């Protein structure tokens, strides 16, 4: 029987700031696999703590991380648009073009963007092992229930945030710089969709990752050094129908709540967040924005 997988990136964190991600999964008796991207220079305390939780560690070379940070902080991006445009055309050919584009993204994109490449690599190497996959942020996420319960078929779920893109300065910035002012104008009145949490069946997730890798490679010349461009790519692609048949779930009606506004949820006497349908929300994202919030998952 195939398992479900939760996979995320935590290359810059020690165990302490992200411990509730793992302890909350233990509380709900999650029986799938947990795979986390970590630096190959991870400290022993963090490494041992993650292994104690049964986490599968996917090592990312620290040299790659350091290079992309230096590149992002340099002035070279001001003149690199044409060289990268030409490089993308050269790489985007042949049967192994996705492999070439993935390596390219790993070199020039911060981990927020290159994580999709590592997710793809891991899933490709374990293609017969998993039924459903949740790609997720780690440090600011906790679990109240199994996020995969009730899923069936070939699902691909994206999760809205509360505000329209025009009111999210970062998302607007990323879309404008990656795809242009006209592209932003066409979708700026639509809700932002969080790239931090996505759930899909194996086949649908692989298609999503392949397209994310390809389009991120394509816009490499438009990077400006500000991390998070994957959010702009994610939203642009969803609203331009790159993923037909996918579901965009209203916040917080589905498996995930992006906790931007406490007015959209209710805290029960059992210290669990429920949505307006009185259903416990399996995944709570951005819980750390409310330090006084007393959740069962944090106890």
Enumerate the predicted regions with their spans:
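N-terminal anchoring/stem segment of glycosyltransferases
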Residues: 1-130, 203
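A short acidic (Asp/Glu
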Residues: 18-19, 45-48, 143-148, 209-210, ...
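A short acidic, often aromatic-flanked loop/helix-cap motif at beta-alpha or helix-coil junctions
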Residues: 63-70, 164-166, 254-259
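Short, surface-exposed amphipathic charged segments that create phosphate/polyanion-binding patches used
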Residues: 70-82, 171-176, 263-272, 298-299
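GT-A fold catalytic core of metal-dependent nucleotide-sugar glycosyltransferases
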Residues: 116-169
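Short, flexible, basic/aromatic active-site loop/helix in glycosyltransferases
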Residues: 173-189
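Catalytic core and acceptor-binding pocket of nucleotide-sugar-dependent glycosyltransferases
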Residues: 187-294
């Amino acid at each position: 029987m195939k398992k479900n997988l939760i996979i995320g990136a935590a290359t810059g964190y020690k165990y302490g700031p992200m411990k509730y991600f793992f302890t909350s999964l233990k509380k709900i008796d999650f029986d799938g696999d947990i795979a986390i991207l970590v630096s190959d220079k991870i400290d022993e305390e963090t490494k041992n703590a993650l292994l104690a939780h049964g986490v599968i560690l996917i090592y990312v070379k620290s040299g790659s991380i350091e290079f992309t940070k230096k590149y992002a902080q340099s002035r070279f991006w001001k003149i690199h648009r044409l060289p990268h445009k030409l490089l993308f055309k050269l790489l985007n050919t042949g049967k192994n073009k996705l492999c070439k584009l993935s390596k390219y993204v790993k070199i020039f994109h911060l981990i927020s963007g290159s994580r999709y490449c590592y997710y793809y690599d891991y899933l490709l190497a374990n293609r017969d092992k998993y039924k459903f996959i949740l790609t997720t942020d780690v440090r600011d996420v906790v679990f109240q229930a199994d996020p995969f319960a009730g899923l069936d078929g070939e699902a691909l779920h994206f999760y809205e945030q509360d505000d329209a893109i025009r009111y999210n300065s970062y998302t607007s910035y990323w879309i404008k710089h990656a795809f242009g002012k006209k592209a932003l104008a066409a979708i700026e009145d639509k809700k932002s969709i969080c790239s931090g949490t996505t759930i899909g069946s194996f086949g649908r997730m692989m298609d999503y990752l392949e397209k994310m890798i390809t389009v991120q490679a394509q816009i490499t010349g438009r990077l400006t050094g500000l991390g998070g461009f994957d959010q702009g790519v994610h939203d642009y692609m969803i609203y331009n129908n790159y993923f037909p048949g996918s579901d965009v779930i209203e916040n917080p009606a589905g498996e995930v709540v992006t906790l931007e506004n406490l007015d959209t949820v209710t805290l029960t006497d059992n210290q669990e967040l429920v949505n307006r349908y009185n259903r416990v929300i399996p995944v709570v994202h951005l819980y750390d924005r409310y330090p006084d919030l007393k959740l069962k998952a944090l106890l």
